[in-house]
């Protein structure tokens, strides 16, 4: 299965690593699709594809801000119990300390971009589709 290293994604997309204590060298992105985990933060995990890169935009961010610390901790624990390749905060939004603490404990890299959610999503999807596209080699002989 084709994959792209998270290190390459960080370099190409100019992402800031908010969890440098997590070794990202061995993390692979294998899915060109992404997910905005709004429903998962609200507790709905049916049909959740944890292999996708997760993006937190302004809507998810403001939802999380409105939760109590206890509810936040519970939502983060449920989300990060899955084997997520990484979570990217858009618009230069910064996660709260509970989020970072949970991510570090579950070894889920947390990244940040200054780009708007829509701009980042379209750029990363386009780039991942090219990098993860099926590829075949055909050997031929000219006579």
Indicate residue ranges for each PLM-predicted region.
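Short secondary-structure boundary/capping elements
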Residues: 67-71, 95, 135
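Conserved beta-strand segments of the P-loop GTPase G domain that flank and frequently precede/overlap
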Residues: 56-58, 87-90
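Short, flexible, solvent-exposed loop/turn segments with mixed acidic/basic and small polar residues
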Residues: 74-79, 99-102, 141
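Charged, amphipathic alpha-helical linker segments immediately N-terminal to NTP-binding catalytic cores
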Residues: 83-86, 92-127
